[in-house]
Amino acid sequence: MKAVIFVKRSVRFPGKHSVLVNGLGLTEGIARKLSGSGLFDETIIFSRDRDFESAYGRIVVDDSGGIILDSVIMAVQKFGDIFAFAWDMPFIRLHIVSAMLLKFDGKSLCPRSSNNVLQTLHCIYAKRDLKALKEYAGNGGKSMHGFIEGNGIMMDYEAKDEICFDNINFPSDLVRLNL
């Protein structure tokens, strides 16, 4: 399976993918963690930024031109089963990733918090669900949550792992998360 990191330019925090976290750009740190984990065949950075560069992942240009649902559909079409990661969540817990890979049985799988929040950009999207993804989008679906709720499997995780899903949206998040 391929790890696919979805990257787009941030309107709220321009240049955030390059913000240094532990000496690496935000996205580059995530790519290094995933590529070094030994859990994936390949780490792909699926970016709308044609100038993005990485030492830890292969850059593939996302020219879907739409919302994240369109990007996920394009990635599943190109790569088959994918483990989708957000480019702005630096606290990936490899034990959660590993547990999800072990539980994956060919059906889209998404972690769910104790307060019922789905983490759709820390989710496995299955090739066998591609037709359902396309139908969902074709029928006006826009939310990845809606797709997973209707077509996926949810996997609960513990409160101690909530940090895994903290993301950086604003410069103030760097302070809040002690980065």
Where are these regions (language model features)?
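Short phosphate-binding loop-to-helix
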Residues: E53-F85, F91-A99
